[in-house]
């Protein structure tokens, strides 16, 4: 990855339980290393208006109050977590200033380029956001088959109660992104996936 990648993905949402529903649609994400100075395409900007843009205010903390990369670095340092060598942000960009980013991911890699920690920022229609710190219990590199649990502490879907757990899977390859989030509770739950090829972002 030399600059910024574009992921033209498909996302799927399937609700389990008494109220069943599922749908899928195409969605565009970008994957960027905010700690590197890279040459950005003409139609894409960081922290300035453009056709497509990424603002630190949208990521790394509460909506419209984000601190971007610094927020992630402080979390990793405060908890002495691995993965501080390279941190990538996977997120939906703004389009003509409009932002809709229900979930974004901070992917944290070690010196050997192994994925060690992921911070998932999940928002809902009420303007709330919560962050889920994902890593293996022994802090070993995260593999595609690993299922990593985290507790859900507020409503994301109006049809889902606040009790239950999130289970994450991350398959981050040089040519493909494949992420799944499963909400588990007695009598129901929710499955969401994000899958798409990685390609350099160009004009």
Spans of features found by a protein language model:
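Mature, function-bearing regions of proteins
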Residues: 1-203
């Amino acid at each position: 990855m030399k600059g910024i990648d574009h992921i033209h993905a498909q996302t799927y949402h399937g609700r389990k339980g008494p109220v069943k529903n599922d749908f899928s649609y195409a969605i565009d994400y970008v994957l960027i290393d905010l700690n590197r100075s890279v040459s950005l395409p003409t139609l894409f900007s960081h922290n300035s208006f453009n056709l497509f843009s990424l603002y630190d205010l949208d990521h790394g903390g509460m909506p419209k109050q984000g601190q971007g990369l610094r927020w992630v670095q402080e979390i990793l340092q405060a908890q002495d977590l691995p993965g501080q060598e390279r941190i990538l942000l996977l997120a939906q960009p703004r389009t003509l200033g409009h932002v809709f980013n229900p979930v974004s991911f901070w992917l944290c890699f070690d010196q050997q380029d192994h994925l060690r920690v992921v911070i998932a920022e999940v928002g809902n229609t009420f303007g709330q956001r919560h962050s889920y710190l994902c890593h293996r219990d022994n802090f070993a590199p995260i593999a595609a088959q690993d299922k990593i649990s985290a507790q859900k502490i507020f409503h994301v879907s109006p049809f889902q109660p606040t009790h239950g757990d999130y289970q994450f899977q991350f398959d981050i390859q040089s040519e493909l992104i494949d992420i799944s989030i499963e909400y588990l509770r007695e009598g129901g739950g929710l499955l969401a996936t994000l899958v798409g090829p990685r390609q350099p972002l160009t004009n």
